[in-house]
From Swiss-Prot:
Protein task: Potassium channel that mediates transmembrane potassium transport. Might be required for maintenance of rapid intracellular calcium release. May act as a potassium counter-ion channel that functions in synchronization with calcium release from intracellular stores. Binds phosphatidylinositol 4,5-bisphosphate (PIP2).
Subunit field text: Homotrimer; trimerization probably requires binding to phosphatidylinositol 4,5-bisphosphate (PIP2).
GO cellular component: endoplasmic reticulum membrane
InterPro entries listed in its UniProt record: TRIC_channel
PANTHER family: TRIMERIC INTRACELLULAR CATION CHANNEL, TRIMERIC INTRACELLULAR CATION CHANNEL TYPE 1B.2
Bilayer-crossing regions: 29-48, 58-82, 91-108, 119-149, 152-178, 193-210, 217-239
Pfam families with a match to the protein in the record: TRIC (PF05197)
Keywords, ordered alphabetically: Endoplasmic reticulum, Ion channel, Ion transport, Membrane, Potassium, Potassium channel, Potassium transport, Transmembrane, Transmembrane helix, Transport
Protein name per Swiss-Prot or TrEMBL: Trimeric intracellular cation channel type 1B.2
Length: 313
């Protein structure tokens, strides 16, 4: 007998069926609505304590910011593939649902929708729905890029990442739409764990599409990626584990990005300075230092004599 009871065991076919079921879920309206709610909450949080006054004074700018962030992945992927950037707005049902969510988050009576959405159990459920939608977007982005650029793995990975984590890049444009801009704080310069996870998921889907190193059934791979996103999202919300890849990055950067070499160079320089400060001076260096002291004394005496002459005059 193992540690896990036999009743808890799940066979391979059941997991594949579960992955196929999750993959065929319709995102509209529930999963999309969860995405819009969390996006509007992110915009409102980014606005800070002036969010209410800003939404009253500049409603169009507030709406445009939320729409840019809600469809950021589609905007960015269209830009990368040379497709019309405005094409994500062709579905009026998506725009209508996003606008309704935006209105409720910013203008609901007594701010009841915002308070309900930020309540931890509700936010937890919305986050799970959004991670399922994120996986669907990454898989769809890789599939679309494979159809257009079948020989370019880099393009396929980039489009998948853009679909899953495009809001971090488009955030610069969104900030311009509401009159603020922070050029030193964007996703390319400081990628979040979500972007890193999207890169990993996009690589997995790309390799699986080409049957390279990932030979498991597509439905099983899809289910594993969904579980990967949900697990780390719950860990971030419940346990405040925000970036599990940071220790690995620090080690890799120290080994392959010059960290060890730079530390060794600093140690050598410090050793040289210590040796130079503690070594015995030669006779010439001692004589030169004595001459410098004598010259300094002569200059001081000359200055003092000049001062006394001026006083006597």
């Amino acid at each position: 007998m193992g540690w896990v009871p036999d009743e808890w065991s799940i066979d391979h076919d059941t997991l594949i069926d579960a992955g196929g079921y999750v993959q065929k879920l319709k995102l509209y309206p529930y999963f999309d609505a969860a995405h819009y709610v969390l996006t509007c909450l992110s915009v409102r949080h980014d606005l800070g304590p002036d969010a209410i006054s800003f939404s009253r004074k500049h409603p169009f700018s507030c709406w445009l910011s939320c729409m840019l962030m809600s469809f950021a992945g589609s905007f960015l992927s269209c830009f990368l593939l040379g497709e019309p950037i405005i094409s994500p707005l062709k579905q009026h049902a998506d725009i209508l649902l996003g606008s309704i969510v935006w209105y409720l988050v910013f203008y609901s009576p007594f701010d009841v929708v915002f308070r309900l959405a930020t309540w931890f159990p509700v936010k937890l459920g919305l986050s799970v729905l959004k991670e399922v939608q994120r996986t669907h977007k990454i898989a769809a982005g890789v599939k679309h890029a494979v159809r257009i650029y079948p020989e370019s793995y880099l393009v396929q990975i980039l489009v998948g990442v853009a679909k899953g984590a495009g809001s971090g890049v488009v955030k610069i444009v969104e900030q311009l739409a509401r009159g603020t801009w922070h050029p030193t704080n964007h996703e390319i310069l400081r990628p979040s764990f979500t972007t890193k996870a999207c890169v990993i998921a996009s690589i997995v889907f790309t390799l699986e599409r080409h049957s390279m190193y990932v030979t498991a059934p597509h439905d099983l791979v899809y289910l594993c990626v969904v579980g990967f996103f949900i697990y780390f999202k719950l860990a971030s919300l419940c346990l405040s584990v925000h970036d599990v890849l940071m220790p690995i990055e620090n080690v890799l950067c120290a080994v392959f990005m010059g960290g060890i070499i730079d530390a060794f160079a600093k140690a050598v320089d410090a050793t040289k300075k210590a040796i130079h400060s503690n070594r015995v001076l030669s006779e010439e260096e001692i004589l030169s230092k004595e001459r410098e002291k004598v010259l300094k004394k002569k200059k001081l005496l000359a200055q003092m004599s000049n001062g006394t002459d001026k006083k006597n005059n």
